[in-house]
Regions:
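Polybasic/polar functional segments that serve as interface/processing modules
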Residues: 2-164
C-alpha cells in the first residue's frame, strides 16, 4: 500500500483511489444503510380473540376500555401520547362494539370489539428506534389478552422494517 494517503482520503500519490480508501467508503456506505434499516425496525403483534369471557363492559363501554388500555400501556412501560375511543351504536345485529386507539411514542395500540360475537382483535406495534421495545409490546399484548379472557386466541408476530 505504499504511496497511499491516510485513511478516508481516497486518493493515492498517483491520483488513483487506493484500496484502503475504497474499503473505508464501502464501510461508511454499509454503516449508513444499516442505520436506515435499523431505524425502521419494529415488532407488530396481532391477536384475534374469540369467546371472550370478560366482563361485558370491556366489549361495550368505550370509556372503561379506554381506561383499561391506558393502564395496560403504563404498566408495560410504554408512553401514550394520544388516544381515541369510539363506541358504535347498537344495530339489528346486536350491541355496538368499541374501537380504541392509543398512539404511543413507540407506535400504537388498536383494539376492536365485537360484543355480539364475544370477539376482539388486538394490534400492538412498537418501533425499536433507539431501544428494543419488544418485551414491552409482549407485556402489553399479554395484559390485554388476560383482560378479555378468550377461550380461543390466534396470535401473530411480524418483524417490520427489515429491507434488503
Amino acid at each position: 500500500m505504499s504511496g497511499e494517503t491516510p485513511y478516508f482520503t481516497g486518493v493515492t500519490s498517483h491520483g488513483q483511489q487506493g484500496r484502503t480508501a475504497r474499503r473505508a467508503k464501502s464501510w461508511v456506505k454499509d454503516w449508513k444503510n444499516w442505520l436506515k434499516v435499523r431505524a425502521m425496525q419494529g415488532l407488530h403483534l396481532t391477536a384475534d380473540l374469540q369467546q371472550c369471557a370478560c366482563d361485558e363492559r370491556w366489549l361495550l363501554d368505550a370509556e372503561a376500555l379506554g381506561q383499561a388500555c391506558a393502564e395496560a400501556v403504563r404498566a408495560a412501560g410504554l408512553q401514550a401520547v394520544g388516544q381515541l375511543f369510539h363506541s358504535f351504536p347498537a344495530s339489528s345485529h346486536g350491541p355496538g362494539g368499541v374501537t380504541a386507539v392509543v398512539l404511543l411514542a413507540e407506535s400504537h395500540l388498536c383494539v376492536h370489539t365485537w360484543p355480539e360475537q364475544q370477539g376482539v382483535t388486538l394490534d400492538v406495534y412498537v418501533c425499536n428506534f433507539g431501544a428494543d421495545h419488544s418485551a414491552r409490546a409482549h407485556a402489553l399484548m399479554d395484559a390485554l389478552v388476560a383482560l378479555f379472557q378468550p377461550a380461543r386466541a390466534s396470535h401473530n408476530e411480524l418483524m417490520r422494517g427489515y429491507l434488503n
